[in-house]
Amino acid sequence: MSKFSKNLKPITFPTHNIGKSLLSLYDVGSMSGLTEVLFMERCLRLLKKGGRMGMVLPEGVLNTSNLQKIREYFEGKAKIILICSIPQDVFIAAGATVKPSLVFFKRFTEEEELQYLGAKTRAEKEIRQKYIGQIKALQEKIVEEKSKKLKVKALIAAAEKELRDLEKAIIEEAKPLTKEYFHYEIPIAMVEDAGITSTGAVSAGNQLPTLQDEYKEYRIAKKLWNEANSAVSYTINSQGRLFRTSDGKEVELKW
């Protein structure tokens, strides 16, 4: 044991998140506590810019109305490069009964981040022009009420609330326009046989290899990304801090 003790070092775990709610560590934590949603954000954060990932997700994440804000969050961070619906049979043997989909993301590159921000800014500016008269009228009303000696707090509060509501409405109305200005194709596929039966046995007509070949041709033709030969590694130091090394560059991954 003595020869090993020289190499053993105590690990100091980070304490900056102790006592905090788990959900508070996530951007989406205020919108949803679903584990699959939190997992999506965590995986996306671990990716380097331009990095890709694939996940198995319940189809509800893609189409349920109460997760709309979640979808908008990820649409502002990454491109969806493929959605593939797979049979419910695939995970029945494991006890899962939810209809699944394979979803593949590519985190924005720095250039795409700027493009998305530009599209969002342009859309919001354009929509704001439609309401500029109302905005100015409310702002003037607030200034006028605050300048009076006998200030009516209820009137000021009502005008400020109306202005906040109008700002929220502008942001919501601009979202479809942002998608229009930041437009890209999202290929969608459906396979009836994913290689596994409802009993967990291997099926004979697996369509996924064919889809893989077809998608490879598609992504090369569309120049979705270039093949990279650089190695990516992850390490945790003695203080419990997580680092990613890629192309010889080390970056600390933080919450």
For the regions a language model picked out, list residue spans one by one.
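A conserved structural/catalytic subdomain of Rossmann-like adenosyl-cofactor enzymes
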Residues: 1-255
